[in-house]
């Protein structure tokens, strides 16, 4: 039995949502990657910012909703976000965090109990896992999942709209599709504006400043067939890169691939 | 004052819908091309088939809804289709018709009074004029309209699903767009399944059997910029080509660009 299946089974036995059970497991040090855990439930990117900078970051997200779709946020100093999960404690419920000081990642703790401050504001941003589930449910193949690697991501020449010290290029993720599949993927992801929504670009990677599709700036390269076109979505790495570039004295994010699992269901994010 | 503006003015004076007034004008021999006439109202492709073949053609349309979206049809021998227009008479209300015998176009009359038969069934199929209006309303440029020519159309290697003697390749129309515009065009036209709906292909024309984008099989070539990709929609020329290839003893279509103007509004065809 896989870890994922075991978590699911224990959740069923306890009568808890699989998402809630997963958070309890991470809280007590069990489990690791959130890939494939609590399928059907929304996973989120995490950004925890001191209140002094939170207003400008909040505006940055509002101004750049495709890379930074807010699905939940906390009051200052409050580690709970009831709208995203019963009993959710942002200090303990993510498998691994990254602590940033002056733009440098200085630590990767498994909880924030030693780092928590009364001025911290938590932002939870939508993640492509949700729309990938919808694409796969429609029968569309996701290349990096087939290949067992990370999605390729690229810095583009598309400038985000700046807010205060938060500024920088949009980072995009890429999934190759045959043309008819690409059209279907536009339709499906359009239904999910809370998790990056429709693609921002397709074909012609050089038009958005991608010189070599085989050399992603983040993640792993995947092959693009001669009968396929690359399709690009705004990516949740954008806010992480922007936070690092802003060189805040202090900030926290999740570690890549180790997300916050919420009690929201992916299907409930569909606008139609 | 243009003919179109004059028609609009006289319609307003008579208290008729502009679409109804346009049909009355065509009925009495006034006016010509339907391009730009009764803006906002649905124009349709026309196929008039003897009842003996109408069942198979109806199934062909049902099996191939993207090139052949039915927006109205008549009872056998009945020249009226009340759902498409008060007072509509299919024998007189289209500016020009094409009469086909054994797959050959033999006449282009301006009415069907001498050709009408009690066994004729009329099919009215959606037309790209409706979705082009929606694209332009969103600010997307339509190249062939900018260039003042006909949309380029191509026979593809996409086989329609056959029904009886009706069979053949899908014909597509092409409009070039920048990638972000192409994504928007997918979204907008998805809202209009009754007028061909979303594109069937984009980029990589050779994948659907188009050897030279600059040599359309119908219509006129238009330039495709190096920063653009060609976007392909199923086209209402498909059923006309299929009807000709079926070599029916007798059939009638509209003459290209001289459509049936209905009282339906384009906006009412939007499914969302």
From Swiss-Prot, chains A, B:
Pfam family, any one: D-Glu_cyclase
Main EC class the enzyme belongs to: lyase
Cited Gene3D superfamilies: PSTPO5379-like, PSTPO5379-like domain
Enzyme Commission number(s): 4.2.1.-
InterPro entries reported in the protein's UniProt record: D-Glu_cyclase, Putative_hydro-lyase, UPF0317
MF term (GO), any: lyase activity
Keywords tagged on the record: Lyase
NCBIfam families registered for this protein in UniProt: PRK05463.1
Classification via PANTHER family: D-GLUTAMATE CYCLASE, MITOCHONDRIAL (PTHR32022:SF10)
Family: Belongs to the D-glutamate cyclase family.
Protein name per its UniProtKB record: Putative hydro-lyase BRADO2538
Lineage of the organism: Bacteria, Pseudomonadati, Pseudomonadota, Alphaproteobacteria, Hyphomicrobiales
